[in-house]
From Swiss-Prot:
Organism: Dehalococcoides mccartyi (strain ATCC BAA-2266 / KCTC 15142 / 195)
InterPro entries: Helicase/UvrB_N, Helicase_ATP-bd, Helicase_C-like, P-loop_NTPase, UVR_dom, UVR_dom_sf, UvrB, UvrB_inter
Location(s) in or outside the cell: Cytoplasm
Domain comment in the entry: The beta-hairpin motif is involved in DNA binding.
Domain of life: Bacteria
Domain Helicase ATP-binding positions: 25-412
Source lineage: Bacteria, Bacillati, Chloroflexota, Dehalococcoidia, Dehalococcoidales
GO molecular function: ATP binding; ATP hydrolysis activity; DNA binding; excinuclease ABC activity
Keywords in alphabetical order: ATP-binding, Cytoplasm, DNA damage, DNA excision, DNA repair, Excision nuclease, Nucleotide-binding, SOS response
Record-given protein name: UvrABC system protein B
């Protein structure tokens, strides 16, 4: 198996070498919990990649939202291009969980829109764990939710080998058991087709399809092919085909599960009738019997995940199988932005249980549905042997449990923590306007954070009236639009962005030289020590970074935040002086923030949003895919979407005609 190998134009600098050394030694000495306290812009991701390469173990990195996970995934792929870096987040573009509101007697059915691209990446992630050890999976909190049993999933793998004798009807039956669908017309993900002696399969985890050619019952040839153009690409001697879904169950297990569900239904009906809940009993009987009939006839039903305990043969109350169970025992866990991610992981179990309990109490689900759930925090910790928590502001859990805290305070660029000024609230808007104008004159950018939506809107409107190019960033803005707005800030379309709690972790905005915090003395979640340090960090990527807090008194949180920033700044100044370093501003390609996230974020559902490929054959393939999407959109009367796709096709065709690089790429 290959080892991890870092590929980068840069060597470890600043605090990075000692951080990598200490964390790696800590892992080697068996430390279970360590924290990397790394300031904004210190290269924490590069440090993480180097630690992974040093210890050479499969690694799970958890991030608290899809956008940051996408950013981290992209960076890890750049640092570890020869290794398997995968992406595992929720595959729902839209998700409305099943629920019941007793006060209104209102039942809400589950409704979801699955993103096929994200589902493909999830399957690629689990497949990688079965085939190699040099694997890094960047995941959201989705990784603690139920997945099929690893050993059951592995038992369904179909190995194919050139020269192997295998009856075709057995292969077809096996593919159906693996949840592949036969479709001779629509050849897409998770489907197969048979034409004479040729079987074609589109695996659930691959861009390319497979063609298996038979001579009688002998496999004569296995070849990969482009599913759009039909072009044959490369011969393959042997390959494993993995199931099309993570939840796969044998016929024997399905029969056992149905018996278990029927027995549980009988017991639960007796309970409800004894309590005088006749309506609930009738409802549960009707719904469960319908599901059982569907499972007997079709092998699945809507909401089949609610019977996962029976299907997996688990005991009542036992933890579900999750992505963590697909990893080998010695895997390493890294929790990015742990002050946000750990509370999120901790809170998932209770929230899910409260919703499910109502469904069970009112006869919509059997009690076993409670076991279709995320891991509790204790169950999560029990599956992790060694963890590294990464944050600029570690939370209480990290501080209490870490056996070693490694600080990474010095930036490779020599940049210092921002200068902090506290000003009174009297006349704050006029003062802020003057400060903003100073930055605008120097072509620098400003972030302003307020406590309320109303205040943000009013301030943004006022700044626009004063001739300042301003945008208000609010919670209703979706992920992609938010990225566009931040990109426009960098490009100078806007000079100022006003927001509430949207300007914190993981934003790379080197042009921002001023962060203004209004109502800084209003103690609370948005003005806690952690929140203030994170917000101040947005100005730490600029040589002249400054933070202005408008307040009439200095709260405990403000003082602690200022003391911590001052401590870090002194360490940075001493390091720069000792090594004769002059702080350098960060120069970052503006397209990165947008293109990088566009390419993998789950919020983007259509190929018309994908960045243009570089190779000619990839562009041709994308054009064919887009034309298919365009016709489908027009057929569904989605004319605006069809027009958008058409415009993208025109752009790509023009690029093919005018770009000499693409014209000659194939011949290089």
């Amino acid at each position: 198996m290959p080892d991890f190998k870092i590929v980068s134009d840069f060597a470890l600098t600043g605090d990075q070498p000692q951080a990598v050394e200490k964390l790696s030694e800590g892992l080697a000495h068996g430390l279970t919990d360590q924290t990397l306290l790394g300031v904004t812009g210190s290269g924490k991701t590069f440090t993480m990649a180097n630690v992974i390469a040093r210890v050479n173990r499969p690694t799970l990195i958890i991030s608290h939202n899809k956008t940051l996970a996408a950013q981290l995934y992209s960076e890890m792929k750049e640092f570890l291009p020869e290794n398997s870096v995968e992406y595992f987040v929720s595959y729902y573009d839209y998700y409305q969980p099943e629920a019941y509101v007793p006060q209104k007697d209102m039942y809400i059915e589950k409704d979801a829109d699955i993103n096929e691209e994200i589902d493909k990446l999830r399957h690629a992630a689990t497949r990688a764990l079965f085939e190699r050890r040099d694997v890094v999976i960047v995941a959201s909190v989705s990784c603690i939710y139920g997945l099929g049993e690893p050993e059951e999933y592995r038992s369904f793998v179909l190995p194919l080998k050139k020269g192997q004798s295998l009856r075709r009807d057995l292969i077809l039956r096996r593919l159906v058991d693996m949840q592949y669908e036969r479709n001779d017309i629509d050849f897409s993900r998770g489907k197969f087709r048979l034409r004479g002696d040729t079987l074609e399969i589109q695996p659930a985890y691959e861009e390319l399809a497979l063609r298996v050619e038979f001579f009688g019952d002998e496999i004569e040839r296995i070849v990969s092919l482009d599913p759009v153009s039909g072009e044959l690409l490369a011969d393959i001697d042997e390959i494993n085909i993995y199931p099309a879904k993570h939840f796969v169950t044998s016929a024997e297990k399905m029969a056992e599960a149905i018996k278990g569900i029927q027995a549980e239904l009988e017991d639960r009906l007796k309970e409800l009738e004894a309590e005088g809940k006749m309506l609930e009993a009738a409802r549960l009987k009707q719904r469960t019997n319908y599901d059982l009939e569907m499972m007997q006839q079709a092998g699945y039903c809507s909401g089949v995940e609610n019977y996962s305990r029976h299907l997996a043969g688990r005991k009542a109350g036992s933890a579900p199988w999750t992505l963590l169970d697909y990893f080998p025992e010695d895997f390493l866990l890294i929790v990015d932005e742990s002050h946000m991610s750990l509370p999120q992981i901790r809170g998932m179990y209770a929230g899910d249980a409260a919703r499910k309990k109502t469904l069970v109490d009112y006869g919509f689900r059997l009690p076993s549905a409670m076991d279709n759930r995320p891991l509790s925090f204790d169950e999560f910790k029990a599956r992790v042997k060694q963890a590294i928590y990464v944050s600029a502001t570690p939370g209480p859990y990290e501080k209490e449990h870490s056996q070693q805290v490694v600080e990474q305070l010095v930036r490779p660029t020599g940049l210092l923590e921002p200068v902090i000024t506290v000003k009174p609230t009297g006349g704050q808007i006029d003062d802020l306007l003057e400060e903003v104008k100073k930055r605008v004159d120097k072509k620098e950018r400003v972030l302003i954070t307020t406590l309320t939506k109303k205040m943000s809107e009013k301030l943004a409107d006022y700044l626009v009236e004063m001739g300042i190019k301003t945008h208000y960033l609010h919670s209703e803005v979706d992920t992609l639009e938010r990225v566009e707005i931040l990109r426009d800030l960098r490009l100078g379309v806007y000079d100022v962005i006003v927001g509430i709690n949207l300007l914190r972790e993981g934003l790379d905005l080197p042009e921002v030289s001023l962060v203004a915090i209004l109502d800084a003395d209003k103690e609370g979640y948005l003005r806690s020590e952690q929140a203030l340090i994170q917000t101040m960090g947005r100005a730490a990527r600029h040589v002249d970074g400054q933070v202005i807090m408008y307040a009439d008194k200095i709260t405990g949180s403000m003082q602690r935040a200022m003391d911590e920033i001052s401590r870090r700044r002194k360490i940075q100044e001493d390091y720069n002086r000792l090594h004769n370093i002059t702080p350098q501003g960060i120069r970052k390609a503006i397209k990165d923030i947008n293109e990088r996230i566009r390419s993998v974020t789950a919020e983007v559902s259509g190929p018309e949003f994908r960045p243009a490929p570089t190779l000619r054959e990839d562009i041709v393939r994308l054009i064919k895919e887009l034309e298919s999407q365009m016709k489908k959109a027009a057929k569904n009367l989605e004319f605006e979407r069809a027009a958008l796709i058409r415009d993208r096709v025109v752009e790509l065709r023009a690029a093919l005609e005018t770009d000499p690089v693409n014209k000659n790429e194939r011949t290089k």
